[in-house]
């Protein structure tokens, strides 16, 4: 079973073993409005925590999505190239952005659990 974490930048992470699936939260997609474009990192890209890894563009604004951990991108959500609205429809499921390996599991300790994230967004 996967463990779910959140960041203060409104990203969610689903951790299964050494692979982490990353996306933006439902709250974030609601704030952005209808997405029209998603620019994802390439598979094989090495990311450091805090790097701008992707861009989600909506009718309102373009926003960076940051790497929540150090690691390497192992898969991207190809469906978003033609259907960025998946992020609006199912942000925390089929609207995931990329999957990456975890290099340093201690970085998970600084992330929020669901209760802490709900407190953050009020």
Curated annotation (Swiss-Prot):
Pfam families: GCV_H. It comes from the Bacteria. The keyword Magnesium does not apply. PROSITE patterns: BIOTINYL_LIPOYL (PS50968), LIPOYL (PS00189). Binds 1 lipoyl cofactor covalently. The keyword Mitochondrion does not apply. InterPro entries: 2-oxoA_DH_lipoyl-BS, Biotin_lipoyl, GCV_H, GCV_H/Fam206, GCV_H_sub, Single_hybrid_motif. GO terms for biological process: glycine decarboxylation via glycine cleavage system. GO terms for cellular component: cytosol; glycine cleavage complex. Keywords: Lipoyl. Residues 19-101 form the Lipoyl-binding domain. The modification N6-lipoyllysine is found at residue 60. Its cofactor is (R)-lipoate. PANTHER family: GLYCINE CLEAVAGE SYSTEM H PROTEIN, GLYCINE CLEAVAGE SYSTEM H PROTEIN-RELATED. The glycine cleavage system is composed of four proteins: P, T, L and H. Belongs to the GcvH family. NCBIfam families: gcvH, PRK01202.1. This is Glycine cleavage system H protein. The gene is gcvH.
């Amino acid at each position: 079973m996967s463990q779910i974490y959140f960041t203060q930048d409104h990203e969610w992470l689903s951790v299964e073993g050494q692979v982490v699936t990353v996306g933006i939260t439902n709250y974030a997609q609601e704030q952005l409005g209808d997405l029209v474009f998603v620019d994802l990192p390439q598979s094989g890209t090495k990311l450091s925590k805090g790097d701008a890894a992707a861009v989600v563009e909506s009718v309102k604004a373009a926003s960076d999505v940051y790497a929540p951990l150090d690691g390497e991108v192992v898969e991207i959500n190809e469906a978003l190239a033609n259907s960025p609205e998946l992020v609006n429809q199912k942000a925390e499921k089929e609207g995931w952005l990329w999957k990456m390996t975890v290099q340093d599991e201690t970085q998970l300790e600084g992330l929020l659990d669901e209760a802490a994230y709900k407190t953050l967004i009020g």
